[in-house]
Design a protein with these regions (language model features):
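Active-site neighborhoods and metal-handling regions in enzymes and metal-associated proteins
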Residues: 1-226
Length: 226
């Protein structure tokens, strides 16, 4: 009930400076919680500023280092007093986001265009009862680098020109997407927003350093990197 989302953003920026590196965009930290407010849109900010117990926190963060860029989004849950684990409904919601990731990356085929992969992945996801948006971009010397695009958050029918490029091997991408999940306990939709660097090569697709499959727990004594 004290720390604000901006406090966290500026702590992260100061930490990056202390390490002698830099961000290539201003980080985002926002909150979803049980409330009667509408799901905020991509071009606006969550109305919540002060982080509370029981919040689902989303962070979008990327650094520049050794001429390359990262672009990552992860989710954390703020444990309530006495809690040791996140609610099952949020655990299940994250799994739906992972399912969209699997459907999408399983469709990576050399020579297929970004638009073809996007539309196939969206259809398969909707057929399985998921409600995704996919907006994945190349990653490398620039945060949004050269190469084929796989949708934009406001262009889910395909992206002219950049989405028409074929997928090539030995390329990297920020696997960026979300899926809406209705939470009966909160009586509202939430977005499971995920983004993680991945590589496509001779052996197919793989995540460069794994992906998030469990919520980060704020208030737990266990360090996330352990």
């Amino acid at each position: 009930g004290v720390t604000t989302t901006d406090d966290v953003v500026w702590w992260m920026r100061e930490k990056v400076i202390d390490l002698g590196i830099k961000t290539w965009f201003h980080p985002t930290v926002d909150v979803q919680r049980k409330d009667d407010s509408d799901l905020y849109s991509f071009d606006s900010k969550s109305k919540f500023d002060i982080i509370q117990h029981g919040d689902l926190i989303h962070c979008d963060f990327g650094i520049s280092y050794l001429t390359l860029n990262t672009d990552c989004q992860q989710l954390a849950y703020v444990l309530k007093p006495g809690e040791k684990d996140p609610p099952n409904f949020l655990v299940a919601a994250l799994k739906e986001g992972n399912r969209v990731q699997d459907i999408f990356t399983n469709n990576f085929k050399e020579g297929a265009t970004g638009n073809q992969i996007l539309l196939k992945s969206l259809k398969e996801s909707f057929d399985q009862g998921l409600r995704p948006q996919i907006y994945t971009h190349p990653l490398g010397l620039f945060g949004h680098s050269a190469g084929t695009a796989f949708g934009m958050w406001d262009s889910q029918g395909g992206v002219p020109h950049s989405g028409d490029h074929p997928l090539h091997k030995n390329t990297t991408y920020a696997i960026e997407l979300n899926t809406k999940v209705f939470i009966p306990e909160w009586e509202k939709d939430i977005r499971i927003m995920l983004e993680v660097p991945g590589f496509f090569g001779d052996k197919g697709f793989r995540y460069i350093n794994g992906r998030q499959t469990e919520l980060i727990l704020v208030g737990s004594r266990q360090k996330y990197l352990e």
